Each structure stands twice: as structure tokens, then as C-alpha cells.
Amino acid sequence: MNTHPTLDLAIIGGGIAGLIHLHYARRAGLRVVLLERAPAVGGLWRELPPWQDIQICTVDWTVGDLPIDGPLQPQVLANIESWVSRFGLAPDIRTGCAVKQARHDGQTWVLDTSTEGTVRARHLVAATGGHNKPWTPPVATRDGSVAECHSSALREPSELAGRRVLVVGGGASALDLLDQSLLHHAAHIVWAYRSLRWFTPTNKRKAVAGSVRPVARLQAQGVPLERQNEQVRADLAARYHHFGLQALQPERPLDLAADQVFPGRATMLAALAQIDRHRGEVVALQNGQAALSDGSTHAIDTVLWATGYRTDLGYFANPALAAVTGVNELSARCGCIFRSLDEPDLYFPGVGLEGFGATSWNFAIMARSIMSHIAGTAHLDLEPLPRRLHHLDLVRHLAARDPVSFGGQDPDDYCREVGLGTPDDQPYPMP
């Protein structure tokens, strides 16, 4: 590609965000290429084990009539791949192509790649995700006597049968691993966490309970954020009381500006009394035991790390970007939701979906406005935001800066039409 003319746009990452941005770039008539280091598209969802599932309803994951047959990893991956086949994206995708370095030379983005030589583009979408590097905390003492596994690497949960398991973490992945440990008959389960995150206690399956629609309706009606918080807090308090989970309530009140509320796990909730819970960190793994910072010691066969992911932007030549390790940190370095303040013509769509929202639909809304900005029909400013925007609030923000894409429709009218007019059992329409 060294002899090719400068492109309008390069996209790094072939997960759901990258493919959606590729579709909207092609629809806008831009000269574009998508670079994916893996042998095939799918991003993190290609790497996850088959038992992993989404934290929201399937109708909130997909968009329009793109098919999704269920919430599990193979079904989610098939949905991601359907973007390629439905919209004929393959000609502009380069798989097995790692970006070794991305730098701006004052005029264009220059990408040094592993298989395509040097790619130049006026604009760059970094769609490598905000959670793309599994992370486990340091442990002062390890002697190898205890097996360790990150949630993303647990391929066969059946291997937990009869084992003494320690689950570490207080978020959604921890609840998943507790559920898997119970379903596959671990002999003993210890749960250690520094802090807990809010979840929705429920007996329903995640794929049913994880709907974004209740909050979306509040947003569509123009309910102020603090009143949204009050209503959701009251609902959660009633649910925690009903399930007898007051001991698991986080210390900090829920704030929809910062928190993602994910569904509880019915199996874990039903068997909570069987789980040995501790607030603390792992300080040592030796002699077949786990020592926690609360002073307790536990005989353990396997540690399951539900400690999440870090952001890896090490491919950027800009040291400030390369040093970023988290989505909140990256979001603070952006204006207008996802425009980089460190480099020109650089977009991080992943920060726009940190919280709650309808995944593909929100990415599509962002992608459409980015392409309008590149084409000159929208003006996405560089104004930093005081807080993250989610779902329909994100739509309102972009509609005011990209009226052409929204057909000149009043942003509030558009949000009411979509948020109140879309049946709960149907995906949002394709933007």
C-alpha cells in the first residue's frame, strides 16, 4: 500500500465498533481501510470462551434486522461477522495486519503495519476497544502451588468440578465466575473483593434482565439525571431488600453518569449462603493457600481472576496516548465524547459506550456522525464534557452538532421517537 494515495480514513480494530465504522465510512463514500491484527474479525469476542455472554439483552446488542440467535459468545461473534457479509465489507478489511506504530506527521496519519507497509490516512478511528488487555493485580508472593486463570481464559468451566475456588473481583465478571463455579460443582467457593458494583438482583436470565429500555424511557422523556438516579436507586434498594442482599450493596450511591448496572445471576443469588465472602485483596498464593488482606487464609486449588481489562494503546507514537491504561483516563483526554485532544483527526469510539447503552446502535450513531464530520457536513467540536454521556444523551449531544444526519429533526423529538416508539422486544432501527 506504499504506492496508494492517502486514504480518507483508517480504522484500527475489527471488532463490532470497527466494522460498524467501516460500514458507515463506505456508505459515506470515503476511501477507507480496516486493519485487524487477528486472522479474522470479531475482536475480543473471537477470543472469549464459548460460555461467555453479553451483559445486556440481545435486542440491545444488535441493530435493525441483523440477526443474533442468542447471548453466548458463538452467537455474538456470528452477529459481528454478519456486518461483513450483509454490507460487503470484506474488500476493505486487512486481517492478520498489526499496526506496529501510529503517528501523525503534521498532515496525515502514518501507520506502520506488519503486512501492508505504510498506510496513510487523513483521519484515524482507534477501535481497539477500551478493554482489550486482560489484567490481574500483582501478588507479593507466588510459588506456583495455586492455579490461576483470568475470566477471559477459562475455556472449560467443567474443570472447576470438585476444586476449591477463589473468585477475585467485585464486578460483572465475578458474578459470572461465581455462577460457573456453582453450575459446575466446585467443592468450595471463596469470593474476595475490594469493593462491589451495583447490579440488578433478579431471577431472570441475563439476556432478559439486562435491558437498557427502562432507563432509555426516562432519558427519552427528558427526565433529569438526578431524578433518573433517584428512580433507579429506589428500584435497586427494593430489589436488594427483597433478595436479602443488603450486605452486598456498594458503599457509594449509584450514579448513572458513571456506573453501569448489570443484571445479577440467578444461580449465584440462590446459592449465596454457600459462598465464603471476604472484603480484601490477595496478598500471597503459596503452599496451596491464598492469604487475603483481611488476615484470612484459605486452602485453594484455583484462583479465578475477575479483575477486568486495561486499555492498550501502546501502538501510538504519542507517549501520552501510549501510557493510557483505562477508559476513564482516555475519556478525560477526549472532547465531544470521542475526539482525541492529544492528536488531530483521531477518534476513540469505545469511550462513548463505557456505561450503558444499546451496543451496535450507539456505535452506529457515533460512526455516522464521525463520517459526517470527515465529509464536512457536521462539526464535532473539541469541548471536553463534565461527565460521560450514555445512550440517548449521547444522541442528543451528537444531533445538535450533526443535524444533517438526523434529518434536521429536533433532538428531543428524535429521542422520544426511538426511545418510546421502539418495542422492547425489537432492536433499535438502523440509523
What kind of region is each of these model predictions?
Residues 2-44, 69-172, 176-197, 203, ...:
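Flavin (primarily FAD) cofactor-binding/catalytic cores of flavoenzymes
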Residues 39-63, 199-215:
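Conserved N-terminal glycine-rich FAD pyrophosphate-binding loop of Rossmann-like flavoproteins
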Residues 54-57, 339-345, 386-387:
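Short glycine/proline-rich, acidic loop/turn segments that cap or connect secondary-structure elements
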Residues 61-65, 143-144:
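Short glycine/proline- and charge-enriched loop/turn segments
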Residues 198-203, 375-402:
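Active-site-proximal substrate-binding core of FAD-dependent oxidoreductases
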